[in-house]
Regions:
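Anionic-ligand anchoring segments at beta-strand to alpha-helix junctions in alpha/beta enzyme folds, i.e.
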Residues: 1-19
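Generic recognition of flexible, low-complexity loop/linker segments
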Residues: 10-14, 40, 183
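Short acidic, glycine-rich surface-loop motifs adjacent to enzyme active sites
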Residues: 19-31
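Glycine/threonine-rich flexible loop motifs
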Residues: 30-39
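A short helix->loop->beta-strand "cap" motif at the edges of active sites that frequently abuts
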Residues: 43-50
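Short, polar loop motifs at secondary-structure junctions
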Residues: 54-60
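Long, well-ordered, tryptophan-enriched scaffold segments
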Residues: 62-63, 67-183
Length: 183
């Protein structure tokens, strides 16, 4: 995801080269002499991890990939959306991972016309909220002692409705316009 939006992992953290078993890389500019990807890919290849490169051309990193998927330039985002669509459709989403490491259970305000419609619901201290299934109430999303919901419509203390962000993602990307045939 970082490269798709123009970032680079050496600025924001890097893949777990020591434990990765399957590494999928999307269209990376290969113009950095000291690029740490080279070292990381060497570690992956030595350990026998699978390396898949998604890039319009099979040069550089793609040439050493275990599998190369050649796509049209500028369509990597569409491919990611089609993959999300298929994973959702096949019910192959690791919800435990999403709950622990992402904002999937964070509640999103559903109040058409309000200034904060579509924003994360927050408590008085500004902490994002989730719905705790065990207590049947809102709770700080980052609390470790809750059982967060990832689907459903819930009522916030102020009476407004909110849904987990994962539900919004699923509703959008399960639409057939994101199927592999459509994109």
């Amino acid at each position: 995801g970082l490269y798709t939006i123009g970032g680079s992992f050496w600025e924001f953290g890097e893949p777990d080269w020591e434990h990765t078993k399957y590494f999928m890389m999307f269209g990376v500019a290969e113009d950095h002499d000291s690029n740490p990807i080279k070292i990381g890919l060497g570690k992956l290849k030595t350990r026998g991890a699978k390396f898949v490169s998604i890039n319009p051309v099979k040069t550089g990193y793609s040439a050493i990939a275990d599998e190369w998927i050649g796509i049209r330039p500028g369509t990597d985002g569409l491919l990611v959306l089609a993959i999300i669509h298929e994973l959702l459709k096949a019910d192959q989403i690791d919800l435990d991972y999403l709950v622990r490491y992402t904002n999937a259970p964070w509640l999103v305000i559903q109040d058409e016309g309000a200034a904060d419609h579509g924003l994360f619901a927050r408590d008085a201290e500004g902490r994002p909220l989730s719905w705790n299934k065990a207590a049947n109430s809102v709770a700080p999303a980052l609390a470790t002692d809750i059982t967060p919901a990832v689907v459903g419509t819930f009522t916030l203390p102020d009476g407004r409705k909110a849904v987990p962000s994962f539900q919004l993602l699923a509703e959008r990307y399960l639409d057939e316009e994101y199927s592999p045939d459509a994109v």
